[in-house]
Regions:
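A short glycine-rich, Lys/Arg-flanked "PGG" loop and its adjoining helix->strand segment in the class I
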Residues: 166-183
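Short, glycine-/aromatic-enriched active-site segment of Class I SAM-dependent methyltransferases
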Residues: 188-205
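S4-like RNA-binding module at protein N-termini
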Residues: 17-72, 76-79
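Conserved class I S-adenosyl-L-methionine
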Residues: 81-92, 100, 109
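Core SAM-dependent methyltransferase catalytic element
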Residues: 234-255
């Protein structure tokens, strides 16, 4: 049986995707003829009756790896989510939403261009209000825009792919409260030009990262958001690219 399927079958992981995360991070081992070994990949065939165990279940704390990233970023910034009204831009399966709720957020509103991706545990949570099929770049006339007052969210978070963060910053700035915090994931591969990206979607040269930082800082400041910090994600991405967070607030001193 495949290693990821075996983990689910044994009740050691809730889903195959969760099992794959555990395997990818080296948190699974199985007892083979030569002793304990790590599965090389999720699809590795293992004996159905073999002894297998999870050595570190940190990957399962949240519905996706994104939760680990945001949880670490909020700790880095010292942003307290207790009782906060939050907006999650690019909600997807809800890793960021899960992290906010586990840190005490009172409510999380989500925006995502996709549909049917939010984890069932979050979709059924009364504290979560998802708006699916909505591009955060243009929310005018949407149910979200009609229901949520502008400048009403204490914390805005974002995790976006295949679009530059700068395209959704106007929406973020419009709905962020005057004393709020924006903690946004920056993925350089979506901020650079095609010539900067190599095989497998990886950024070719580390020298491109300062250009991305300047682009994000300039875009924030043009919208009245002052950057408090710009830092490498404490938890690495899964595709080999470096990721960063920008922490910005209205009317604060630049860092």
């Amino acid at each position: 049986m495949r290693a990821d399927q075996l983990l689910v079958h044994r009740g050691l992981a809730p889903t195959r995707s969760a099992a794959q995360r555990l395997i990818d991070t080296g948190a699974v081992r199985w007892l083979g003829p030569k002793g304990w070994a790590l599965p090389r990949k999720a699809g590795e065939e293992l004996p159905d009756g073999c002894q297998i165990e999870v050595t570190d279940d940190a990957e399962l704390r949240f519905v996706s790896r994104g939760g680990l990233k945001l949880d670490a970023a909020l700790a880095h910034c010292g942003v307290d989510a207790s009782g906060a009204n939050c907006l999650d831009v690019g909600q997807s399966t809800g890793g960021f939403t899960d992290a906010l709720l586990q840190r005490g957020a009172a409510r999380v509103v989500g925006l995502d261009v996709g549909r049917g991706q939010l984890a069932a545990s979050l979709a059924g949570d009364a504290r979560v209000t998802p708006h699916e099929g909505l591009n955060a770049r243009d929310v005018a006339g949407s149910a979200f825009a009609q229901q949520e007052p502008t400048h009403s969210f204490d914390i805005v978070v974002a995790d976006l792919s295949f679009i530059t963060l700068t395209h959704v910053l106007p929406t973020i700035a419009t709905w962020l409260a005057p004393a709020g915090h924006a903690v946004l994931l920056v993925k350089p591969q979506f901020e650079l030009q095609p010539e900067d990206i190599g095989k497998g979607g990886l950024v070719k040269h580390a020298s491109a990262y300062p250009r991305v930082e300047k682009r994000i800082r300039d875009a924030c400041e043009a919208l009245g958001l002052t950057v408090r910090d710009y830092f490498a994600s404490p938890v690495t991405g899964g595709d080999g690219n470096r990721e960063f967070f920008v922490w910005a607030c209205p009317g604060a001193e630049s860092a």
